[in-house]
């Protein structure tokens, strides 16, 4: 899987855990406020980190790191995501997935396979304002609603944050 960034230590991205964060490239939204716009708009530019560099870090930091946060961009668009998550889990790490919720079938597959210990779904705005907020005119929020239901009924820890 193409890894577009790696934060080797975070105390913020996986609540209550010492973790690292893996960044994927590409996204199916065009949010005007995106804080990772370079990963979204130009995923082929910039840093590309070999998977083996991630796994070397995870091996070296066993007993220090507790989990891995996978974020983006939109990780569910990344080819090889589920394989990467499985390898991380095999090493004994917890996995947190950040998603925009646009791919409910992918979210369900990940949950059903036991690949995520926590899922943080970024709900961008009220359903009525989603098109403006996500940068896609006329966006149908049905996949967002479906992902919310899948996550909430899964038994997996959802991450909830409200300002």
Feature roles, as predicted:
Residues 1-17:
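Short, charged low-complexity linear segments at domain edges
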Residues 2-7, 26, 40, 54:
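SEC14/CRAL-TRIO lipid-binding/transfer domains and related phosphoinositide-recognition modules
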Residues 6, 37, 73, 123:
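Fold-independent oxyanion-binding glycine-rich loops
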Residues 16-49:
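Canonical Radical SAM [4Fe-4S] cluster-binding loop centered on the CxxxCxxC motif
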Residues 23, 71-72:
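A secondary-structure boundary/capping signal
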Residues 37-68:
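Conserved alpha-helical substructure of the radical SAM core
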Residues 42, 74-76:
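Short, small-residue-enriched loops and turns at beta-alpha junctions
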Residues 55-67, 76-163:
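Conserved AdoMet/S-adenosylmethionine-binding subsite of the radical SAM
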